[in-house]
Swiss-Prot record:
PROSITE patterns: RIBOSOMAL_S19 (PS00323). InterPro entries: Ribosomal_uS19, Ribosomal_uS19_bac-type, Ribosomal_uS19_CS, Ribosomal_uS19_SF. This is Small ribosomal subunit protein uS19. It comes from the Bacteria. PANTHER family: RIBOSOMAL PROTEIN S19P FAMILY MEMBER (PTHR11880), SMALL RIBOSOMAL SUBUNIT PROTEIN US19M (PTHR11880:SF8). GO terms for biological process: ribosomal small subunit assembly; translation. It holds the Pfam family Ribosomal_S19. Protein S19 forms a complex with S13 that binds strongly to the 16S ribosomal RNA. One of its GO terms (molecular function) is rRNA binding. Belongs to the universal ribosomal protein uS19 family. GO terms for cellular component: cytoplasm; small ribosomal subunit. The gene is rpsS. It comes from Picosynechococcus sp. (strain ATCC 27264 / PCC 7002 / PR-6).
Length: 92
């Protein structure tokens, strides 16, 4: 179930302030954030945002196709190394 249209999209206040500040100055800097739940807004297009995946910050370049999605969708939290070669149960 999605978020109510009446409420609008969620975005961390600190992240929104940083984006607006960079848009006003015209700078292109990497913005570090831990807010994976923030929705990508049209103001963010063209910026690189480093999203925390639990271990490190993954740089995400925001494009127009990403608008409306969450930042956490583009920073995977799990790394699959593959099943063990001798483990026949897992490969079945």
């Amino acid at each position: 179930m999605g978020r109510s249209l009446k409420k609008g999209p969620f975005i961390a206040d600190s992240l929104l302030k940083k984006i607006e500040k960079l848009n006003a100055s015209g700078d292109k800097q990497v913005i570090k954030t831990w807010s994976r739940a923030s929705t990508i807004l049209p103001q963010m297009v063209g910026h690189t945002i480093a999203v925390h995946n639990g271990r490190q910050h993954v740089p995400v370049f925001v494009s127009e196709q990403m608008v409306g999605h969450k930042l956490g969708e583009f920073a995977p939290t799990r790394t699959f190394k593959g099943h063990a070669k001798s483990d026949k149960k897992a490969r079945r």
